[in-house]
Curated annotation (Swiss-Prot):
Present with 799 molecules/cell in log phase SD medium. Gene3D superfamilies: 2.30.30.100. This is Small nuclear ribonucleoprotein Sm D2. Component of the Sm core complex, present in spliceosomal snRNP U1, U2, U4/U6 and U5. The core complex contains SMB1, SMD1, SMD2, SMD3, SME1, SMX3 and SMX2 (Sm proteins B, D1, D2, D3, E, F and G, respectively), and is probably a heptameric ring structure. InterPro entries: LSM_dom_sf, Sm, Sm_D2, Sm_dom_euk/arc.
Amino acid sequence: MSSQIIDRPKHELSRAELEELEEFEFKHGPMSLINDAMVTRTPVIISLRNNHKIIARVKAFDRHCNMVLENVKELWTEKKGKNVINRERFISKLFLRGDSVIVVLKTPVE
């Protein structure tokens, strides 16, 4: 990747240069965590704005953190009076809109 593409404003880049820049950013920038998880098919932990947590494999994603996930386990808690109930459900495939994502973590190695 030439520094000429990285340093130039995006509106000056051609479509091919924009695609090359996006690919570079996915492999070397903050999105590399999601890209690596997608390529190696390792699960990630995703914390959502509604305080739910998701453990899933990333099938696809974009620059807005929209993700297609598979083998999804969603975890959350519910309060019933003084009792706290841990809830979970399984979803085989899920499209997750990126604006609900707070943080994406690698799953710990067991």
